[in-house]
Curated annotation (Swiss-Prot):
GO terms for biological process: lipoprotein biosynthetic process. GO terms for molecular function: N-acyltransferase activity. This is Apolipoprotein N-acyltransferase. The active site is at residues 269, 330, 382. It holds the Pfam family LNT_N. The gene is lnt.
Amino acid sequence: MRWISRPGWPGHLLALAAGALTPLALAPFDYWPLAILSIALLYLGLRGLPGKSALWRGWWYGFGAFGAGTSWIYVSIHDYGAASVPLASLLMLGFTAGVAFFFALPAWLWARCLRRDNAPLGDALAFAALWLALELFRSWFLTGFPWLYAGYSQLQGPLAGLVPVGGVWLSSFVIALSAALLVNLPRLFPHGASLLLGLVLLLGPWAAGLYLKGHAWTHSAGEPLRVVAIQGNIAQELKWDPNQVRAQLDLYRDLSLPQQDVDLIVWPETAVPILQDMASGYLGAMGQVADEKNAALITGVPVRERLADGKSRYFNGITVVGEGAGTYLKQKLVPFGEYVPLQDLLRGLIAFFDLPMSDFARGPADQPLLKAKGYQIAPYICYEVVYPEFAAALAAQSQVLLTVSNDTWFGTSIGPLQHLQMAQMRALESGRWMIRATNNGVTGLIDPYGRIVRQIPQFQQGILRGEVIPMQGLTPYLQYRVWPLAGLAGVLLLWALLGRQLRPQERRLFG
């Protein structure tokens, strides 16, 4: 087995396969032990490698993880971006090769500055800290790509009880720590005290997760709200067709009008496929309908802002009519889907760079939440729900979470189910109910433990009815966010860095 930790292709190919295990630990497969196995193989494969070899070992791991785990990007480019098979494949390979460096650079840093092969416990802790730092960096760099976090594998796993304490971050940290400790345990057997401490570090977090699973961190803030969510199942090729606007508006109106005994009616992202000011008459009429039902109607709609120079800016928005108020403008935009980086260079090259409604502006920070039926509703439009810290900031001010999306871009791939799993994790982190309304699935209601209690199957038009309970109180994660865990990771990385620089006789303090 020593070949695993040696430079060269055998180890690189194993790293590629180990990375490809990542999506199997997540939705829709949910074989969560594979997250530990995947990271353990990477950790073992980096042992003893020099910096350059470690960089490529990490790159191959990342190529496997993103190549298998974000294969839905090919669907978006080919099926909806009108790119040919060769071009879509080339763009997908280029994207995967680029994001694989998210793992390559930390692997190089690990080999050059942090790894201490003679200190099994300290090495495992530092590796887990570096893994956490990597996931944090991925959520921020170039607007972020916080996909395929190891911690999502624990949505309903043994570590689910730790998620309200430290978010998906804590789950990822424990998984990485467990992977490294399992690799290092054989080296601890001759040392009784170190072995005991290693077992405590390995088993303690899992025991704590099981103990806290199901603990109620929040409590009811009022009577249940009766919810109706509409899943229109509009084909993407019809979505922005001007000739189909009236049919879409009529569809959502006709599905909503018969609904009785309802507090909230929710439509998906851009369910109203024309600008808010152009749809003012329609929205006003639907607001009157909602008022007559003593309900609030919440819908996705693009919003235009006219500027002083006569130009306009466009936003992806959510608005409330009826017994509620507020319009929210999306802050976290999808590259190429909602805006085009370097658009002066890329616009017009291929159809993928000229998708409909791909010129949105970013909404301002610190927007007020939506209000409906007397409660504060935290809104997340599509991609925004995958950002843990961003979502937590809004959730802490709210009693109910709401996410609207159009996952038609993913086709029949695993993308929509990965997206749903991340939404479920936001509910678990915050201890709040979440309403999820999508164009073609999965529309559902999620309880404060991240469980789906009602849903409409994908690719079907349907009406979901159910209840959500407004919640109050803050989970530890909403109170303190990632900062305590990030501080711990910083200390562990500094500890490893200092331990690496000391003379051998001084390293015992840091081992």
